């Protein structure tokens, strides 16, 4: 689900990490992702025990955000806080921002919110392997991307 992001993506995210959040509909995207991933349940455990919390973080994705936060001099939290709704939401915002920056670099344009979710769900490399195309996504990811695009007024 949440594949490892390269160190290059982390470096890109260090440069104005929060800029993307202000240019898009981040609060709405966060709400949609939490609804899709866990029905807004901070105690959720999925993916055979590998995904935790409202945003269904895997340990490696959580660690990527912790590493970024440490480099930025920000508080990094233990993986057990994936079940803390406030902490997990902050981590999800950072992680979606990392993904957005990575997709921007790879796609040569700012990604749509549904594309960010597709990369969140499939991994950035997994989404790249699918040619960044909606039509190539698995049906369950297509349904979620359609929900996000519709809610945020985006085209697929």
Which residue stretches match the model-derived regions?
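Short, functionally critical alpha-helical segments immediately adjacent to catalytic or ligand/cofactor-binding
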Residues: 25-41, 92, 116-124
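Sec-dependent signal peptide recognition
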Residues: 2-11
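N-terminal signal peptide c-region/cleavage motif recognized by signal peptidases
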Residues: 16-18
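Alpha-helical segment that forms one wall of the substrate-binding/catalytic cleft
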Residues: 59, 63-114, 119-128
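Secreted/periplasmic proteins that engage bacterial cell-wall peptidoglycan
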Residues: 32-74
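Catalytic and substrate-binding regions of cell-wall glycan-acting enzymes that process beta-1,4-linked
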Residues: 111-156
